[in-house]
């Protein structure tokens, strides 16, 4: 792999470009924002147009913008393969099915909770799990290109069906974001900030750090995955209702112990992940 084009030079796109540059890859980039283009250019991403054939074009925009881009650009010039890194996959992959370019849906399991920070952090992609969804336009050559791309990142390649991806990601990412916001809602509506911060420690900080996420990303995930989010919010409310119905101390201990055992088993198998 010699060169990559990244469309969308926000936090994720720029950091991906910087990671690839550090591996000796020529990175071209473009964004609708002049500010983003200028920032990326100063960091070493080439924002000039090129007629050179591109090995891989990556769509690194918010989900709804990726969807709009795919609707308007069924054919993308001088590229061998197309990949997106959006947080939901069903709608994106449905559009990629119709693409004239061999296309694969992607979702790197990395990022920063505070995605309004512009400090370069290209290392977030290193050794990340990279979820991939095949589409009707996917070719064997495009799979090889993606595999080589992920080797550059030292990332783990995991293939998953688009429907299954969106179902699971609603539990592991989308619902936690909404619960985090709900907890902040309780705190800010009922208590003074000095009272909250004077008594807050790891529990509150850990449970609410996701509220630092750009609201546009949250709206995108809800717009494109509302069916799964609503389904599991109902499951979550049922779980809360069951906790409220526990009458005996032993019942609550048993409930909490079951959760502790499951979470510890998860940590033992996969290790603890650093908070970002």
Describe the predicted segments one by one.
Residues 1-49:
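NAD(P)+-binding Rossmann beta1-loop-alpha1 motif at the extreme N-terminus of oxidoreductases
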Residues 52-53, 127:
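Alpha-helix C-terminal capping/helix-to-coil transition sites in glycosyltransferase folds
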Residues 3, 26, 102, 129, ...:
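Residues at the starts of beta-strands that form the adenosine-phosphate
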Residues 57-58, 83:
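N-terminal Rossmann-like NAD(P) cofactor-binding module of classical short-chain dehydrogenase/reductase
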Residues 5-6, 59, 132:
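Hydrophobic Val/Ile/Leu positions in short beta-strands of Rossmann-like dinucleotide-binding domains
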Residues 124-209:
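Internal alpha-helical scaffold of NAD(P)-dependent oxidoreductase catalytic cores
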Residues 63, 69-119:
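Rossmann-like NAD(P)(H) cofactor-binding subdomain of soluble oxidoreductases
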Residues 193-263:
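Interdomain hinge/lid region at the active-site interface
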């Amino acid at each position: 792999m010699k060169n990559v084009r990244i469309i969308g030079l926000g936090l994720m796109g720029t950091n991906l470009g910087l990671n690839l540059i550090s591996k000796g890859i020529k990175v071209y980039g473009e964004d609708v924002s002049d500010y983003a283009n200028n920032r990326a250019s100063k960091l070493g991403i080439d924002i000039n147009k090129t007629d050179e054939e591109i090995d891989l074009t990556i769509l690194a925009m918010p989900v709804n913008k990726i969807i709009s881009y795919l609707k308007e650009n069924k054919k993308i010039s001088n590229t061998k393969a197309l990949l997106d890194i959006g947080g939901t996959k069903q709608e994106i992959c449905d559009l990629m099915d119709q693409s004239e370019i061999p296309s694969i849906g992607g979702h790197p399991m990395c990022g920063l909770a505070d995605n309004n920070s512009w400090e370069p952090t290209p290392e977030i992609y290193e050794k990340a799990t990279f979820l991939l969804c095949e589409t009707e336009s996917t070719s064997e050559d495009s799979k090889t290109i993606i595999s080589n791309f992920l080797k550059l990142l030292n990332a783990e390649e995991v293939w998953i069906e688009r429907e299954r991806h969106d179902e699971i990601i609603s539990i592991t990412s989308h619902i936690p974001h909404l619960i985090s916001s709900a907890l902040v809602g309780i705190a800010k509506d009922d208590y003074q900030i000095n009272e909250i911060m004077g008594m807050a420690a790891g529990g509150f900080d850990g449970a609410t750090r996701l509220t630092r996420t750009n609201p546009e990303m949250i709206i995108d995930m809800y717009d494109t995955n509302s069916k799964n989010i609503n389904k599991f919010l109902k499951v979550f409310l049922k779980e809360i209702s069951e906790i409220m119905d526990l009458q005996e101390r032993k019942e609550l201990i048993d409930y909490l112990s079951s959760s502790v055992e499951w979470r510890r088993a998860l940590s033992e198998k996969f290790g603890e992940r650093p908070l970002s």
